[in-house]
A protein has these predicted regions:
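Short, Lys/Arg-enriched N-terminal segments with co-localized hydrophobic residues
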Residues: 3, 8-21
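Cytosolic, long alpha-helical scaffolding segments
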Residues: 17-239
């Protein structure tokens, strides 16, 4: 069998046609483990936010119990920050600068997800904000869809290390991520309309509500953007 041509200066394990791995085997395993640890910590932050939102949308919710849940979100976000730094420090091997840059870009973008989770929780507590009760079901739905999005994103990132060729040939998982983002957009638009139709709310209250809605839905947008980054990364490795 003819071996794939590897241009001079390209580390072993990386082929110009997007081989099954981006790095040499040992380095591939190391970086795979580090970035998946980071994504797990980001996911834990999202799960903590889900608990916070569930408590904030429960009947009779008050601000004091949310303070402790907000603290949990912030602690999880800090852990995700530490994981990001650890992952970046692990990118010290002899592989293509473009690969290093792509991985850092994906990791730092995912870290923004944890940051947004923290923003939602702490700002809601600081401002003692609660979504209008009529919107609670839709807010919960947005969080649920966003979690599904992130689960798919985590799987797609993992495939970069173990099923690279498969992902190059069939990136339907990235389309699924974008499809879920469209679902979030649809629910977001409905909530926008719902809020501005509430005669009992002052304009300032409506603007505050849609501002928090924007921040919450930004998480879904970031996940979609990371999916786009992955697809660009794949395209750049096809010759």
């Amino acid at each position: 069998m003819t071996k794939p041509y590897v241009p001079k200066g390209v580390p072993r394990g990386h082929t110009s046609k997007g081989g099954s791995t981006m790095l040499n085997k040992n380095k591939n395993n190391d970086i795979h483990s580090l970035i998946m640890d980071q994504l797990t910590d980001v996911e834990n932050t999202l799960v903590a936010l889900e608990g916070f939102i569930a408590a904030s949308t429960a009947e009779g919710a008050t601000i004091e119990p949310l303070r402790a849940l907000c603290k949990t979100v912030r602690e999880k976000e800090h852990i995700a920050d530490v994981s990001l730094r650890t992952m970046i420090e692990g990118l010290d091997g002899p592989f293509l600068p473009s690969t290093r840059s792509d991985l850092i870009s994906i990791a730092t973008s995912c870290d923004k997800i944890a940051n947004k989770c923290e923003d939602v929780a702490k700002l809601m507590v600081y401002q003692r904000f609660f979504f209008p009760a009529a919107c609670n079901a839709s807010i919960t739905e947005i969080v649920e869809i966003t979690k599904k999005q992130f689960e798919l994103l985590k799987s797609a990132v993992s495939q970069l290390f173990g099923k690279f060729n498969t992902l190059v040939k069939n990136h339907a998982i990235l389309d699924d991520i974008r499809g879920l983002e469209s679902q979030v957009d649809s629910v977001e638009e409905q909530v926008y309309q719902q809020i501005f139709d509430m005669d009992e709310l002052a304009l300032s209250q409506k603007l505050q509500a849609v501002n928090f809605l924007d921040i919450l839905c930004d998480i879904s947008d970031i996940i979609e953007n990371v999916a786009d980054q992955i697809q660009i990364m794949l395209i750049n490795r096809i010759v």
